[in-house]
Amino acid sequence: MVRGVIPAAFLTVAGLCGVPIVLPLSLLPVDEPGARLTWALTWALVPVLSLMASIMRVANHRFYTPDDIDGSGLTVGTSRVVILRAIAQNTLEQAVLAVAAYSIWAAAMPRSWLRAIPIAASLFVTGRILFARGYDRGAAGRAMGFGLTAYPTFVMLAALSIVLTYRAVNWVLGR
């Protein structure tokens, strides 16, 4: 498992720290709340579409598999649909965190830091593909995909927690 998470952590750090090289400031939205939120929500479409793809995989499988057509509420389900549902559930969990992180990031962070959002979204979809492809191989097969999906969001949420706590403390202290 470590073999998958270490490269994912490295790619996350490289992506988020190297983003100024990849994405010039001129491509960012104007520094206005509506434009910032539009930027975040545009990129939030990537995790949402990843979730849609996961749901579609479950639906397509059910449509073509008589043992699974009745749905999870009425049948136990084949091992394949159980795996597809687990992937969809994990994608839902990751997408909720990512969309929240992108939105809060866009509202709270300096304009130049908005470049992190498209990198995080790109890593998200790459991670979801690798996670789904590796799922059958257990934790080691999922590790890289999970890391690429989760780590950018976790880093963003941790940074937001630090920045917003710092701002709140300064506000309370009257600075």
Each predicted region: which residue ranges?
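Hydrophobic alpha-helical transmembrane segments and immediately flanking/interface helices
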Residues: 101-129
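Juxtamembrane boundary at the C-terminal end of a transmembrane helix
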Residues: 158-175
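Membrane-helix interface/capping segments
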Residues: 53-78
